[in-house]
Amino acid sequence: MRQGLAAYQATGSERHWPYYLALLADAYGSRGQTAEGLSLLAEALAPMGRPGERGWVAELHRLQGELLLAQAGDRHRVPEVETCLHQALDVARHQQATSWELRAAMSLARLWQRQGKRQEAYDLLTPVYCWFTEGFDTADLQEAKALLEGLA
């Protein structure tokens, strides 16, 4: 994947570059290489002033929070994780990006569930999930439903 991104970058195109970096960061995170993933997310968030690239900001912040949580392994970075996830929620809401909002809400709800804040997690996720009227066979909505059932 890294080679493919290098080849793409060599073309001089920067279109969707933050998104591609986010995909690679997520892959690194899945392999436990959180430092590499966080470095890529920092790079992805840097050019967010460019027109057309702001659509990924919510997901970038969510992934940053997820990787920070995976890296921390303890409670010392939880405030930083929560800040990232709240930023993801705020950006998604401002952009009216319901799919990104659902993902951010699920991430924050899972964190709160681990902290014993089950009711807060349920109250956060329920209205976001209820906005959807279709697509209930998608992975995100199935995951949200399962999370809500576990919180109820």
Which residues fall in each region the model found?
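Helix-coil-helix junctions within alpha-helical repeat/solenoid scaffolds
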Residues: M1-A152
